[in-house]
Amino acid sequence: MNSFNEKVVLITGAGNGIGRATALAFAKQNASVVVSDINHKDGETTVSLIKEAGGTATFIPCDVSREIEVRALVDGTVEAYGKLDIAFNNAGIEIEQSKLADGDEATYDKIMDINVKGVWLCMKYQIPAMLKQSASAIVNTASIAGLGAAPKMSIYAASKHAVIGLTKSAAVEYGKKGLRVNAVCPAVIETDMFRRAAEGDPKKAEFIKSMHPVGRIGQVEEVAAAVLYLCSENAGFTTGVALPVDGGATAI
């Protein structure tokens, strides 16, 4: 894989899980990484891990559902490093566990504000900065729930379908200007969220694993590797793609 030497990378939701793993992976490839998260402690921890490994990173807190904070995040990135080459819009939430008719408006608004408006706001402010470069790339975190149905998670599924729609639209609108826009669609990945869901319930953990033809859940580093590929020169002819990282789950 190509080195990301001298590239400036902005990652939201980088305080843990997939975001942290991707921040570490970019830093290992010599990128300067702007770590962003709503949780200051988690974000600062990611920066510390990068610096301990010899990398370059800065933390800028951000609630991606707030336009003023997203604008400040992008402006702060350019102020710190002079440009923006790559963005990984990873911040998102998954809180729904009810059938559609049992859902409530507050849950709908919260999921859509972060998962959809957050990605839209990030791209709205990232794109003008990125078009100043000859080649740039955005990757948005969707989900396999954005590729089909997700029982008892209809609002979440709708939000991830929307992320894919935003991704494809941006790819078409800005492709001739050197900007590639793709999405990653993870299945179940071993994160703190998964561990909390399966804690004390071995049968549930085994059932979740069985959903994937490879017989296991994914690792955050595997999603990070997909993101780095999509942002690399090796993926120069790849844009508008929603890439499953799912152990074969969508093949069933």
Regions found by a protein language model. Give the residues of each.
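Conserved glycine-rich cofactor-binding loop
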Residues: 8, 15-17, 39
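Short C-terminal tail/terminal secondary-structure segment
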Residues: 94-97, 148, 228, 239-252
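Substrate-binding pocket helix/loop in short-chain dehydrogenase/reductase
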Residues: 98-100, 104-110, 208
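Active-site helix of classical SDR
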Residues: 123, 159, 167
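Alpha-helical segment proximal to the catalytic Tyr-Lys
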Residues: 128, 172-176, 236
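Residue(s) in the substrate-gating loop at a strand-loop-helix junction
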Residues: 143
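C-terminal helical subdomain
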Residues: 183, 206-238, 247
